[in-house]
Swiss-Prot record:
Protein name, entry field: Probable protein phosphatase 2C 62
Compositional bias ranges of the Basic and acidic residues kind: 365-374
Similarity comment text for this entry: Belongs to the PP2C family.
Cofactor (UniProt): Mg(2+); Mn(2+)
Catalytic activity: O-phospho-L-seryl-[protein] + H2O = L-seryl-[protein] + phosphate; O-phospho-L-threonyl-[protein] + H2O = L-threonyl-[protein] + phosphate
PROSITE patterns documented for this protein: PPM_2
Residue positions binding Mn(2+) 1: 514-515
UniProt keyword list: Hydrolase, Magnesium, Manganese, Metal-binding, Protein phosphatase
EC number: 3.1.3.16
Co-factor remark: Binds 2 magnesium or manganese ions per subunit.
Ranges of residues in domain PPM-type phosphatase: 482-719
Amino acid sequence: MADHLILSLQAPPFLIFPCSLHRSWRFPGGIRYSVPEFRLSSQLQLANSISPSKSSASSSSPPENSAPEKFDLVSSTQLKDGSHVFRFGDASEIEKYLEAEEKARCVEVETQNAKIAEEASEVSRKQKKLVSSIIETSTEKEETAAPSDLSNVIKIKDRKRVRSPTKKKKETVNVSRSEDKIDAKSASVSNLSSIVSVAEAIPISSTEEEAVVEKEITAKSYNVEPLSSEAMKKVSVNKIGDCETNGYQENRMEVQARPSLSTQQEITPVSTIEIDDNLDVTEKPIEAEENLVAEPTATDDLSPDELLSTSEATHRSVDEIAQKPVIDTSEENLLNTFEAEENPVVEPTATAAVSSDELISTSEATRHSVDEIAQKPIIDTSEKNPMETFVEPEAVHSSVDESTEKLVVVTSDVENDGENVASTTEDEITVRDTITDSGSISNNDDTKVEDLQLPVPETASLEPIKAASGREELVSKAFYLDSGFASLQSPFKALAGREDAYFISHHNWIGIADGVSQWSFEGINKGMYAQELMSNCEKIISNETAKISDPVQVLHRSVNETKSSGSSTALIAHLDNNELHIANIGDSGFMVIRDGTVLQNSSPMFHHFCFPLHITQGCDVLKLAEVYHVNLEEGDVVIAATDGLFDNLYEKEIVSIVCGSLKQSLEPQKIAELVAAKAQEVGRSKTERTPFADAAKEEGYNGHKGGKLDAVTVIISFVKIVST
């Protein structure tokens, strides 16, 4: 074979030509071909090819007049050294190659189509499964919901059947058994025991709802004989039906104790019962809904001296409370007066039995006007504490403001001029009638309140005053800061970004920082470090569970957590009660103004002139920080600012602006804006005398005059007090 395979007229199936890119080749026939020509030509013809070797082996050379064979470029490959390898073949071989390539492509397309069809079928199967599962779950829910709906329908039907209009006219009530009936005409003490047993048999449920309907059993009206001033109690049995508790109905009995009003009134009670002194006291509590309440009967003609329970009186208007004395039946107040074992009282959680010791007698004084009640002493008949007076605790349902303004007093001798008693908009006189251990004042006792004479303690009227002063001593004062801020950039440095940063947190924390502008020469944002430093301080204060109060510790932790490059001055202040704690590093500062004068201010910290002390990563804040402690009063003004304020305005100028703004009742935000604007206005001046010009002159820079135009950030805080 020749040096180049292309010279062989009977070439192997593929002709391989190594060559470099754009390298020309000369064939013996004088035709030159380059690499691009090989690539672009679809078919090459070699004619008049003569072997360069003139050897005698003519067997490898074609005949001289043989026709040129057609061949085409099959592929080209670039090697690592930059050379190219071309593969040529005749027409039949190229056709075979193309057919094989087409078959491979068809197989690949069919494979992809099969995969797509399989995926589509899988998705459709999943969708069918999902739809079927949803249908099954919905069917199950409907099946499970059907019984509950049916029970509700049954309950509603039962409820309608129970609430028949004929029930209102009946004089007896059937409870659980037909033989347990209460005759409203002939009820006696023996019937009360059956009522108690029925009440105890009521099922108790934690989920018991409030009574929806309360049906009173009315009896025929009849006149009650006058009982003079003896105490009389009416016990009514109310049937509360149709209460749905845990899916079943239950009937509950509510025992209500009501005081009698006048002796010659027509009363429509359920039953009037004379309480037996020998009746055993049962202290088994029922549900909270079945409380013994003292309320007037709806069918009575109410007089102005109507007695109200404590729970009702708290929901009445001020005018109604002013006209009516209140019987306090709360457990807390009565237990403070008497022993619980000897004098049981009507508690919010009602007891099943009603004994003579549980009745609160109504004194003769309740039938007089408010002025007469105020003038008459309230007599305590208890044997143990005959001279004891009380101060009623604050009502549960009243607000904090009402409880501080109202003074509830029970005393045997109240000194007043009549006007305060008539108004009674601020003071309530709670009338209490107590009973003795032996039951000397009872329903059957003829002893009257007017006949009882007990000594009146002279110091009784002083106890409410002591209690009121004690409540005043509990009122504490909390100090807080009402703050506003203003931050103005330097016109010359506005393009480089904001260099100042600040924060205000929880009405008792403020902070301010001034980034060092020289960092901008190194391509670092001069304000990034200051902003991250203040942001970390605010996070530490907000997230601190132990309520950290030392500003030095806050600044120390913030420096350790700050990752940005740069440096900054910093000032952190914290108000703890009335003491202001400040940690300062650099030429930012603070001042406290009280009554138009400077109470306290900070001193700038410099390495030398125009080179303030600053903090950066790795600094020991505990050693660098300068700490201040200032005791504040209400009305003081705290100012924290960067050097842009203190370099351009003297302290007396700042005080003048603040005091003038206070006279105009301006808010801290507005004052901060005025102070910052004035500082930048002076900073633009070339002639005014400024603190910065004075400092430059002291350092030997006599040529500088006027202000120093710089960024200004100011926080103005008013010290205020809130009562707790």
